[in-house]
Structures are given as C-alpha cells and as structure tokens.
Amino acid sequence: MKILVPCKRVPNPDLKLKVANGSVDLAGTTWQVNPFDEYAVEAALRLTEKGKGGERVGEVVVVSIGPKDTSAQLKQLLAMGANRAILVAGDDSALDSDLVARILRAVVAAEKPDLVITGKQAVDGDDNQVGQILAASLGWPQATFLASILLAADGKSATVTREVDAGVEERRVRLPAIMTVDLRIIGKKAVRNEALAPATAEWEDTQRLASLKGIMAAKKKELREITVESLGVTGGILVKTLRHEAPPARKAGVKVASVEELVAKLHNEAKVI
C-alpha cells in the first residue's frame, strides 16, 4: 500500500506574530510541520507497519509545497519514518486552498497512491478546505475529522470514526480515498491495519519523535524537488487575502469583593441583567 501525506509548514504557533500595515511580519519566524499533518504522518506510519516498531510494509510518501528551505520540515518527517519526500518548490504565501488542491491532484496522478491522509486543517489559516476540494476534484470518497481508522485486511476499504456534536459517527469508506485527521487519531488504538497488526496492538498516545537512527537514515532517503510547472498546473488563486489585523485590545478584568458587587456591576455597567 502506498499512502500519500500532504504536509504544510506553518509558523510556530507558540510564538506571537507581529501584524503591521495589514500584513504579518514573518521575518525571523521559526517554521514547523503543521501539527495536524504530523498526526496524519503518524497515522500513515501505523497503517504500514506490523505493530509498534514493526517491519514496514508499504510506502509512506510526504509532499509539501513551499520554498526550498521547506526541505527541513520534510527531512524531519523522513526521520519520523516516511519513505520518500516530494517538495513542490514555490512561494507558499501565494497559495489558496483551490490551488493547493490542484497541485496535489497532479501529484496524486503521478504517484497513484492507494490512500491520501492529511491534517484536518492548517493551524495558520484554519481553512479546512484542501482535503475536501481534492476529493471532489478526484471524484474520490472522503472522510474528514477522523478520530480512528481501521483498514480492512484486503486493503479495499476502511472503517473510520469521527466525533460530531451528537456523539461518534462510524462510516465505511472504499479506497482510494481522501482522509483528514483530528487530534484523537494518535490514540493508542486509533489506527490499525487488520492485515498487519493484531487487535491487541498499541502505539504511544502521541506522534513519534525522530530518533538518532531515524535522523541518520533520513539522510539516505529520497527528497525530490519538482516545480508547479513540471506538474502541468496552470491558473492562479481564487481567494485573495486582503489584510491581516491583530485582535483589538480589551480592557483588563476587575476583581470584585462580593456577589452583591458583581451583580451591581453586571446591572449598572455591563447592563446584562
């Protein structure tokens, strides 16, 4: 089985970005793999190995669109255990969800994966669109916001669960398909391939970290750089971001000494009661 995992580099979400003159100042920003895409890589690795730390059966290919230094994030994913990496070189600030999906559709056509798994959304834009657009353009089934994946022994379908407002929804999806994953996908028993791992198989309750052995092995793995033009993708973006603005400053909270004082402030100042 071949699994393709599209991944995006994002600014470190723990750092405060500077917003000025309608744009975000990314000078000096540190970049990392979008956390939800890391979860997708972990899910793909579990689906292609014989239990925790077991032999890999199949191939996990990661792909990212961005400038040349995005190779640093791809090398991290190779060190995690991915077999190959593809960098579609280009300006990742000049993309929208539709163009990303068109580029990925061309990559899918070239790679012919059995399954595409990606994060439910990127933490910088929070658009939650690429997986759905890609599935629609390919005419493939899609399963989004997944909390678990159980791949059938014949590799032709998967039973998946997703958390919804009313509880947990279970579906069966035929392959090839597009899947987007949520945080719970890295649970101990959230992902399993019936053909490779027994029902008792468990993994760590988190995504794996790159080991020294993995880092050394990554140096010998293929990281291929291609261009958007070589994929035959034409046309520009459909959605343009006009400006970014920082949230307006809020007044500091106040402490009250009693319930009576709180009620008085809610009535006289906030005027909500």
Which positions does each model-derived feature cover?
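N-terminal glycine-rich FAD/FM-binding segment characteristic of electron-transfer flavoproteins
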Residues: 1-273
